[in-house]
């Protein structure tokens, strides 16, 4: 099941149109092809009438991918609590720390590539087709690679006030519901 699910996720990633992201200077000196699913901070988006966090617009642009990624992490670690999923294509991150994360993160890389190990404080980890738990507050980066590499990072953001885990929420464009479909918050 997990192998089939990984292939399904990879096929969906291959068929996903990735935007150019210029707002991640802590991870790369160059624009990246990436986006965020789940709940996000709204930085510099004036049209949101003062709202500071809520559902990512990418949840509704890529609903099938969003659902598949939630199934993927659930198939590996059913009890893992997270709010946000960073989705990267061919992104070679420079050494950085994730200052806006709380607790451990899980990362996996999918695709047809060589190289691209995750390095955490000088220790290398092969994350191709396998999840790795790590502390984003430790310096980490990606080794050079060749080919198409998709990395998925599942983490909890330091929202104030805290938000419940995405693992137990249903998110639409305008609201967040709990697992019993009870309204938690409208946007």
List the model feature ranges, each with a label.
Residues 1-131, 137-187:
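Fe(II)/2-oxoglutarate oxygenase catalytic core
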């Amino acid at each position: 099941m997990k192998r089939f699910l990984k292939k399904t996720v990879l096929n969906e990633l291959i068929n996903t149109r990735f935007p150019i992201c210029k707002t991640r200077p802590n991870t790369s000196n160059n624009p990246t092809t990436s986006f965020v699913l789940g709940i996000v901070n709204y930085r510099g988006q004036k049209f949101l009438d003062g709202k500071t966090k809520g559902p990512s617009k990418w949840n509704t642009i890529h609903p099938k991918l969003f659902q598949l990624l939630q199934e993927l992490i659930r198939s590996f670690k059913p009890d893992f609590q997270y709010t946000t999923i960073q989705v990267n294509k061919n992104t070679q991150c420079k050494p950085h720390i994730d200052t806006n994360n709380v607790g451990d993160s899980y990362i996996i890389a999918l695709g047809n590539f060589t190289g691209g190990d995750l390095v955490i404080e000088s220790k290398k980890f092969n994350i191709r087709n396998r999840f790795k738990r790590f502390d984003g507050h430790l310096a980490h980066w990606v080794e050079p690679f060749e080919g198409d590499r998709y990395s998925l990072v599942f983490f909890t953001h330091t929202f104030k006030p805290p938000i419940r885990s995405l693992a137990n929420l249903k998110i639409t464009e305008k609201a967040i519901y709990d697992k019993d479909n009870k309204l938690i918050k409208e946007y």
